[in-house]
Amino acid sequence: ATEKEEKERQGASGALRALLCLTPVVLASVMHGLLRDGIITWAPSYLQESFRFPAATSIALTMIVPPVNLAGVYAFNWLRNRLRWHETGTAAMAFAVCGAGIVLWATLGRGSVAITLMMLILSTTCMAGASTMLLSLLPLRFYRMGLLATVIGLLNASAYVGSALSSVGFGALSEQWGWTSVLVAWCAVSAAGAALCAMARGVRRAFP
């Protein structure tokens, strides 16, 4: 009985350490939710106010985004397999490319519908790739510890927190300081997401 209790304590301790290692990934999942749903939710309003499109046209233009985003799932999964990267490293790259796209959007796309749509597609495609890495593939590494469902639930809940914050936060930001401030905020969130994924060394060491 004593040996069994010791094994149970060791298992609980290992599970706790594993979950603590996930702290940067949990925060990165919040950033992912902020960006993914923030961009998708507010893109029609951005197009309507920036280019004077009717609401129906703005919504129709953003409807092309989800099908194209599937390319991000395959592209970043291919990159991970090709370069033998960890999921957190691949997600960091997705955040970085997303941030670069938003910088181009902010600097070159304010007067161009074509550039705006291209950068909109690029940024959301990157977030589709990050979603696959953080919310689908990374939790599989915790299967042997019996934490698969826990990690999936934790990371998805974190993404939903970001999604909820984006619904209110970016709308208030655009009303107060305009769309430039929203684009700057998206750049900052992208940088934070990339940094948090890069900081997730504990996960990479424990689950290479």
Describe the predicted segments one by one.
Residues 142-177:
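A late C-terminal transmembrane helix in Major Facilitator Superfamily
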Residues 31, 64, 68, 122, ...:
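Small/hydrophobic positions within alpha-helical transmembrane segments
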Residues 1-25:
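Juxtamembrane intracellular "pre-TM" segments in multi-pass secondary transporters
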Residues 105-107, 179, 184-208:
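Multi-pass alpha-helical transporter architecture, strongest
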Residues 54-62, 116, 148, 152:
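Juxtamembrane helix-start elements in MFS-like secondary transporters
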Residues 86-137:
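C-terminal transmembrane helical hairpin of 12-TM major facilitator-type secondary transporters
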